[in-house]
Amino acid sequence: MSELTTLARPYAKAVFEVAQGAGDLARWSDQLGFMAAVVHDPTMKAFLDSPKLTREAAADTVIGVCEGRIDDQGKNFVRLLAENGRLTLLPEIAAIYEVMRAEAEGKVEALVVSAQPVSDAQKSAIAQSLAKRLGREVELVCEVDESLIGGAVIRAGDLVIDGSVRGRLERMAANLSR
């Protein structure tokens, strides 16, 4: 676990608990996603990293850019992060929050990396199979990586299924070298 994740987790957990208690998981998801995008922008990142910038000015700047996209609770959250020098953690906070939200809603995002594009029928079959195995609704994200040679690698949470030709070749090579 990276240091950023360790620092971001308590903030994500606190926001998640507030959002869940108020039944506002989707609203907070939107706000955190937007704030994270703002802070992740290279120009904004360089501005926020300036040693001459006060924490109050950093908060005011982020709030100003986010005006109309975040509510008063979102603004208070930005101020809290700024006071603690943690504004640049917003992308990690948003990512952790999304994992918590998906868990609470009984969903999981699965990444399918395949050597060739996955057809709609294959997507449906993969999603159904994973949903049965994981006991949750599965949202697929598909990517193509020709270096796999053939097959696919599926990642859903802690589960990794490597059915790629490259993976098989690497396992065979490892077994032969023993």
Swiss-Prot record:
Superkingdom field: Bacteria
Residue spans crossing the bilayer: none
Bilayer topology term: Peripheral membrane protein
Any one GO MF annotation of this record: proton-transporting ATP synthase activity, rotational mechanism
InterPro entries: ATP_synth_OSCP/delta_N_sf, ATPase_OSCP/d_CS, ATPase_OSCP/dsu
Keywords annotated in UniProt: ATP synthesis, Cell inner membrane, Cell membrane, CF(1), Hydrogen ion transport, Ion transport, Membrane, Transport
Cellular component terms per the entry's GO annotation: plasma membrane; proton-transporting ATP synthase complex
Compartments (UniProt record): Cell inner membrane
Family: Belongs to the ATPase delta chain family.
General function of this protein: F(1)F(0) ATP synthase produces ATP from ADP in the presence of a proton or sodium gradient. F-type ATPases consist of two structural domains, F(1) containing the extramembraneous catalytic core and F(0) containing the membrane proton channel, linked together by a central stalk and a peripheral stalk. During catalysis, ATP synthesis in the catalytic domain of F(1) is coupled via a rotary mechanism of the central stalk subunits to proton translocation. This protein is part of the stalk that links CF(0) to CF(1). It either transmits conformational changes from CF(0) to CF(1) or is implicated in proton conduction.
Subunit relationships: F-type ATPases have 2 components, F(1) - the catalytic core - and F(0) - the membrane proton channel. F(1) has five subunits: alpha(3), beta(3), gamma(1), delta(1), epsilon(1). F(0) has three main subunits: a(1), b(2) and c(10-14). The alpha and beta chains form an alternating ring which encloses part of the gamma chain. F(1) is attached to F(0) by a central stalk formed by the gamma and epsilon chains, while a peripheral stalk is formed by the delta and b chains.
Protein name, as recorded: ATP synthase subunit delta
Organism in which the protein naturally occurs: Thioalkalivibrio sulfidiphilus (strain HL-EbGR7)
